[in-house]
Curated annotation (Swiss-Prot):
Alpha-D-glucose 1-phosphate binds at Y107, G172, E187, K188, S205. It comes from the Bacteria. It comes from Rhizobium radiobacter. The lineage of its organism: Bacteria, Pseudomonadati, Pseudomonadota, Alphaproteobacteria, Hyphomicrobiales. This is Glucose-1-phosphate adenylyltransferase. Its EC number is 2.7.7.27.
Length: 420
């Protein structure tokens, strides 16, 4: 990312975050919450990354469309994102599916989530709309994408990530020319088209779109009138524009925010238990690819006032310690040993317990002598004394949600079924 140009484009934009998805591949982690509300990084929620990018980019009008099990997400947004000032032309709207257009319809797709709220969006009169997915982990300055959108005269500008070509089969892929104009949009292709001049890589859609607002409103109205449409940006709106208008690809490397340019641009879809575990554990590295300590690009979130973490006991066989770990406030490590683990707020790890490669969500209690490795422990779980996880794959698979790579998800309902 080059030196930032001072432009007012972000102030004329509205960010619209699509946060209604369930995230079913996260299994029990999303039984009680939408994927954007899942905890990440020790104190934040996944949605905080898209919202923080918008705020740090200078965007001061934000809408968040919610749908699936939205209570915890809405509560988080109300508590952590209520600082916008209408008298300064700022706004923050939470937009649950509420059958505004039809008495029988919820949001039928991503485009429909915009269409059903046209009467809320249009009075703000933003010049540009930045459509964002609320369930990805990355840091990006949207001002650069807005500038490219204006300079290119595009109808839509699509954020794209360069990925090895044969890893792009699970994405929507952009087939572009030498000017990064999109010739074709292919959903999950078996043979992804390469990038001109770099054929070993493909441009995968990040689910980030920039439109002139007037054009977008016309597009979603036209789509709503089409009985054959699935009401989706990736399946309907974008392919229509590629065929009938001008679509341009914006490369994430041109606008990603990173503290060290030796690192590759960081973007993660933490949509599986393995990916979620790995992205959190990566934060325990000496210099992680994702810098959450960058004061120039903070990740804003709701944070309760908590006491600091505490480590107690220093006996030979009972020493409160943590190595290569992230430990949040209000944690008490009472004679327990942590290695390469990430603990959210309010965790209690009792004497003689050991955690290795563990992601522990808030308010978890670890019983004495528990030995846990390669785990994700859900919010509020009480781990019984002496429980061992990570040593017997067959037993772990019977008791918990164990992935093929050996990561175990532990929830309270699973613990309650144990015969200990």
């Amino acid at each position: 990312m080059s030196e930032k140009r001072v432009q007012p484009l972000a102030r004329d934009a509205m960010a619209y975050v699509l946060a209604g998805g369930r995230g079913s591949r996260l299994k029990e982690l999303t039984d009680r919450r939408a994927k954007p509300a899942v905890y990440f990084g020790g104190k934040a929620r996944i949605i905080d990354f898209a919202l923080s990018n918008a705020l740090n980019s200078g965007i001061r009008r934000i809408g968040v469309a919610t749908q699936y099990k939205a209570h915890s997400l809405i509560r988080h947004l109300q508590r952590g994102w209520d600082f916008f000032r209408p008298e300064r032309n700022e706004s923050f709207d939470i937009l649950p599916a509420s059958q505004r257009v039809s008495e029988t319809q919820w949001y039928e797709g991503t485009a429909d989530a915009v269409y059903q709220n046209i009467d809320i969006i249009e009075p703000y009169a933003p010049e540009y709309m930045v459509i964002l997915a609320g369930d990805h982990i990355y840091k990006m300055d949207y001002e650069y994408m807005l500038q490219q959108h204006v300079d290119s005269g595009a109808d839509v500008t699509i954020g794209c990530l360069e990925v090895p070509r044969m890893e792009a089969t699970g994405f929507g892929v952009m087939h572009v020319n030498e000017k990064d104009e999109i010739i074709d949009f292919i959903e999950k292709p078996a043979d992804p088209p390469g990038i001109p001049g770099n054929e070993g890589f493909a441009l995968a859609s990040m689910g980030i779109y920039v439109f002139h607002t007037k054009f977008l409103m016309e597009a979603v109205r036209r789509d709503a009138a089409d009985p054959t449409s699935s009401r989706d940006f990736g399946k309907d709106i974008i392919p229509y524009i590629v065929e009938h208008g001008k679509a341009v690809a914006h490369r994430f490397a041109d606008s990603c925010v990173r503290s060290d340019f030796e690192h590759e641009p960081y973007w993660r879809d933490v949509g599986t238990i393995d990916a979620y575990w790995q992205a959190n554990i990566d934060l325990t590295d000496v210099v992680p690819d994702l810098d959450i300590y960058d004061k120039s690009w903070p990740i804003w979130t709701y944070a309760e006032i908590t006491p600091p973490a505490k480590f107690v006991h220093d006996d030979e066989d009972r020493r409160g310690s943590a190595v290569s770990s992230v430990v949040s406030g209000d944690c008490i490590i009472s004679g327990a040993a942590l290695n390469r683990s990430l603990l959210f707020t309010g965790v209690r790890a009792n004497s003689y317990s050991r955690l290795e490669n563990a992601v522990v969500l808030p308010s978890v209690k670890i019983g004495r002598h528990a030995q846990l490795s390669n785990v994700v422990i859900d919010h509020g779980v009480v781990i019984p004394e002496g429980l061992i996880v990570g040593e017997d794959p067959e037993l772990d698979a019977k008791r918990f949600r164990r992935t093929e790579s050996g990561i175990c998800l532990i929830t309270q309902s699973m613990i309650d079924k144990l015969d200990l």
